[in-house]
Amino acid sequence: MPMPPDDSALSLLPDHPLAAHNTFGIDATARFAARVTHAAQFAALHRDPRVAHLSQLVLGGGSNVVFTRDFDGVVLLDEIAGRRVVREDDDAWYVEAGGGETWHAFVAWTLEHGMPGLENLALIPGTVGAAPIQNIGAYGLEMKTYFDSLVAVELATGRSERFDAARCAFGYRDSFFKREGRGRFAIVAVTFRLPKRWTPRLGYADVTRELDARGIAPDAATPRDVFDAVVAIRRAKLPDPLELGNAGSFFKNPVIDAAQFDALRARVPDVVSYPQPGGQVKLAAGWLIDRCGWKGRTLGAAAVHDRQALVLVNRGGATGADVLALARAIQDDVRKQFGVELEPEPVCV
């Protein structure tokens, strides 16, 4: 009788090119790569003598990474699939997705199955497993709002752990997995709590303008209307990584205290800002970069997108060093002109 397949077996791909595995399209090579389709493969890594001693990098869609050099270790390509409703009660559905699921496809699937809530996060690149690391957000919604829990494998021990929101310690484009837990875990499944009573989030003018252009009053908008509007806005503003390499918004919108904001507004009365809890103020990083004259400018083979100053692009053949040099030049100018620090969103490897 043939033996059943071993779900923990890992097939290594030596000298694996990474350009197709990062949305910037940066040419780098991994000493090894491996496609991971089962959580058991992550759990068995620490016992595999071929890779246990090597540096390990879990990669989803590669939409939040800048490769600055070849990776002398094993890149673990998270392709764990699956979407299901794990349970429901009178108030909500609890929906689980595999870490390797494409985020946008998952959002579309929830809508198709009558479970709205995530539509403001449509078309954000990357995978479900990467979403909690960054606490992705757009158009007035952060992922943490509907997050329930996740399952992650600690790579050094193979132990599976469940994390609730408190353990994830979500912040603005931040989480435990981007700080203390960076590089230690592989997220294999994420569960979301989607309320059965839908609450539209239409606080951003871009969304209401797009709805208006479609002849839809905000109070009459359906979840599908909001989804379609967000998709249209993102496609109009952001370049397709398949056509022009990029990682979406490259910098976080900086958050400053009230005293710093008052001093800045005294010098720059038209500065774009958004009040935050606790008296803090969020600034529009794209506006700051544009005001410094960077929109459309190039440095080496990297450039600032000509329609969205928050997006850095690969004009063809850009290296990670090109992208970082451009980012640092922008940071220097914004610091000199506004006294504000810009923090990159992508992780540099």
From Swiss-Prot:
PROSITE patterns: FAD_PCMH. Its EC number is 1.3.1.98. It is an enzyme of class 1 (oxidoreductase). Its cofactor is FAD. It is found in: Cytoplasm. It catalyses: UDP-N-acetyl-alpha-D-muramate + NADP(+) = UDP-N-acetyl-3-O-(1-carboxyvinyl)-alpha-D-glucosamine + NADPH + H(+). HAMAP family: MurB (MF_00037). PANTHER family: UDP-N-ACETYLENOLPYRUVOYLGLUCOSAMINE REDUCTASE (PTHR21071:SF4). This is UDP-N-acetylenolpyruvoylglucosamine reductase. It comes from Burkholderia ambifaria (strain MC40-6). The gene is murB.
